[in-house]
Amino acid sequence: MYRNILRKLKRQINTILKIYIFIKKHEHHLRKLFVIFQVIISIVLLSLSVTTNDHDHLFDSWYYFASHLILSLFGIFVFFKKSTNSKLLYLYVILLSGLLITASFSFFWYSGELNIIENTCISDQCNHDRAYYRKKTYKIIALIVVEGVALHPNLSWLIQVLKKERKLKQLNTINNTNDTAIRSPSLNNISGNNNNNINNNNINNSNNNINNTSYNNDYFNNHNIINNNKNNIYNNNNKINSELQPPSILNKNSKPIE
């Protein structure tokens, strides 16, 4: 029992995956087919609204279906000629989503009117109104299905185009930075030479400072040695002179040498 259920689930999952893979492979062609189908449905609904003279509601009149036809023709132009233009795709998706919102609003409007008639009116006099609002709801349901089916692949394609444009912008910025770096090697050499000259000047200045400090230290040391030698010579001369002078001159109270 459980094995049969699991087998059925596997088969269903496999079929869903096959359909998904098929849609992904032929996504661009299916998108074009959806747009063509949208044009056909809008022409049919427009012709029905014109023949039946539906002028009772803004969202279910002939000019609403005419605007839908114009938008579907614009979608054919976009997908067959400008399929990589993100701005036109963005405009088409916004307009199509606006029509989908108005169609859903009109569906709730007419379905509400139909429920009111079915719940309040029991006599045969309301059969005409009942049939009228039923036709309206069926047309709006068909339009909502077509617009919803057409909106999803268009939105996914718009997202893909925007991602590709972002990647291209990033690659262009990287290439521009690389080109500027390649085209201006002289600036790099000049900056490198300036840095080398600055470093060499700093090294030379430091060496000169070291040499100057060592020279000054040697000079002061030699000068001190010379002064010390002069002082020693002066002291020795004083001693010699004091020994050579007579005692009377040295000291008046000193006795003469016998």
Swiss-Prot record:
Q: Which cysteines are joined by disulfide bonds?
A: none
Q: Which GO terms describe its cellular component?
A: membrane
Superkingdom of the source? Eukaryota
Q: Where is the composition biased (Polar residues)?
A: 242-258
Locations listed in the record: Membrane
Q: Which residues lie in coiled coils?
A: none
Give the membrane topology, semicolon-separated if more than one: Multi-pass membrane protein
Tell me which UniProt keywords the record has, alphabetically. Answer: Membrane, Transmembrane, Transmembrane helix
Give positions of region: Disordered.
237-258
Q: For this UniProt entry, which segments traverse the membrane?
A: 33-53, 59-79, 88-108, 140-160
> What is this protein identified as?
Uncharacterized transmembrane protein DDB_G0276999
